[in-house]
Amino acid sequence: MKDSSNLLEMRNISKEFPGVKALDNVTLKVKKGSVHALMGENGAGKSTLMKCLFGIYHPNSGEIFISGQKVQFKNSKHALDNGVSMVHQELNQVRERNVMDNLWLGRYPKKGLFIDEKKMYDETEKIFKDLDINVNPRDKVSTLSVSQMQMVEIAKAVSYKSKIIVMDEPTSSLTEKEVSHLFKIINKLRKQGISIIYISHKMEEILEISDEVTIMRDGKWIATEKASDLTMDLIIKLMVGRELTDRFPKKDHIPKETILEVNNLSDAKNELKNVSFKLRKGEILGIAGLVGAKRTETLETLFGLREKGSGDIILHGKKVDNSKPFKAMQNGFALVTEERRQTGIFGKLPIDFNSIIANIDSYKTSTGLLSNGRISKDTQWVINSMKVKTPSQKTLIGSLSGGNQQKIVIGKWLLRKPEILLLDEPTRGIDVGAKFEIYQLINELAKEDKGIIMVSSEMPELLGVCDRILVMSNGMISGIVNANQTTQEEIMHLSAKYLSVTGGVNNANQIKEKV
C-alpha cells in the first residue's frame, strides 16, 4: 500500500550501463508540497535517478508511482505532460527568441490557425505575477541574466501544471540576493502543493530550504532524514562514507622568490583599474570579492582573453606580451575557466581529445597526422596523475562527474608545463569529496613551484587553500592579506570598500600587505 502523503515514490530503482551499475535498488519518497534535497558526491547516481524519473533513461528494474498511480514515462515529453519538470543546470533555451516563445515552444495557444499572441502574453504575465518574476515576456532571452533565465525555466515548469519540479544545482551561478529570491519562489511553489526535488552541493542552502534530505553514495540509497536533524558534518560523513576531519589538506608548500609582477594593470574598458600585485614561485594567491568585483576579468586580462588597456605583466623580471591567449600560453600561462561546460571541455568528445587539445600541434608527425601513440601516452598520464575515474580514454568527457571533468581540464594544461596557473572557481559544481582532491592537487602543484592564482566565491576555501588573498572591490584592489592572519569579516569589509566608487583609480601605495 502506498503512503498517501507521498506525491512521488520511486521504489527499488536499478539502472545498468555496459560494465557499470549506476543505480542499485534505490528508493526515493517525496511528500506533496515539500522540498526534498538529493545529495551525494558526483557519480553517486543523483542525475541518473532523476533521468529515470524524467523518462530520459528507463530503469532495468523498479517502479515509479505519482499520486499512488504507477507511471512509466516513454520520454521527457511524456513526463512533462504528466506533471514532472526538470530545471537543468545548463539552461535549455532558444536565446534569440523571446521569453514567452520559450515558455510555450511547441504548444502555442491558437486562435483558429494562428498563434494567439495576446493569450500567450497574458498567460505568461499571470505566471510571472504569481511567482513575483520581474521579466518582460517580450524580451529576448539573450538579454536576460542567468538568474532571470532560471526563473523563466521555473515558470515554464509551472505552465505545464507540474506537480514535481526537479532543480539541478539551481544556485550555482546566482548571487546571494538572487538565491534569496529563488527561495521565495520555491516557498510559493511549496504552498501550492508542488514538490521540489533540489539537487545541490551547497550544504548551507540544503539545510535552509529543505524539508527532507536523501543521501546517495555509489549508486545506492544511504539515508533519508529530516533536514532539521542533520548537520554539515553528518551530511559529509554520509556522503563520503567516512569522517572528513579536515576540509582542506595541510599547506606543506613553501613560497619562494617572486616569479610574477603585475604593475598597474587596467583593461581596455577600464573596468580593471591599476591592479598591482606580486606572485611567488610555489605560492597560492587567492582573489576574493563580491559579484562585480572583476575577479574573472583580472584573470582574462592576464591571459589575453580581454584586451589590456595599460600596465605591465613581468615574468622572471622581464615584460611579457600576453595580448592574445596563444601568446600567454607560449609565455607559460594557463587558464582554467569558470564555466567548465561552456569553455573548458568539449562535452561530446572523448577524454583523449580533451586532454591534448591545448597542446594539439605538438602531436603532429612529419606527415601532418597526429601521433596516436603519443596522444594515448599523454592521456593516460593525465588520467593517472589526476586520479581520474573513467573506464576508458575514449569515454565522452561529458558523461563524467564534474570533479573528474575538472581534473582533465587541469591535466590538459599541465601537459604544457605552465609556470603560472590561473584558476577561476576551480571547485564550482563539485562535490565535497572531489573538492578535497582538487585542493590536494593545487597544493601539489604549488610544491612543484607553480605560481597559482585562484578566484573563489567560497571564503572558507580561500582561507583554507591559499597563502595570501588579494581582495577586489569594483575593479580595484582593496587589500592583500595573509590567509592565516585574516578573518572572513575582514575580507567582506575589504570587498565592500569601493562599492560607492564609480571612477578613479586605485592608489597602490594605500594598500597594506599583511605578509
UniProtKB/Swiss-Prot annotation:
InterPro entries: AAA+_ATPase, ABC_carbohydrate_import_ATPase, ABC_transporter-like_ATP-bd, ABC_transporter-like_CS, P-loop_NTPase. Keywords: ATP-binding, Cell membrane, Membrane, Nucleotide-binding, Repeat, Sugar transport, Translocase, Transport. It is a peripheral membrane protein. PANTHER family: CARBOHYDRATE TRANSPORT ATP-BINDING PROTEIN MG119-RELATED, GALACTOSE_METHYL GALACTOSIDE IMPORT ATP-BINDING PROTEIN MGLA. The complex is composed of one ATP-binding protein (MglA), two transmembrane proteins (MglC) and a solute-binding protein (MglB). The lineage of its organism: Bacteria, Bacillati, Bacillota, Clostridia, Eubacteriales. It is found in: Cell membrane. It comes from Clostridium perfringens (strain SM101 / Type A). This is Galactose/methyl galactoside import ATP-binding protein MglA. Signal peptide: none annotated. One of its GO terms (cellular component) is plasma membrane. It is an enzyme of class 7 (translocase).
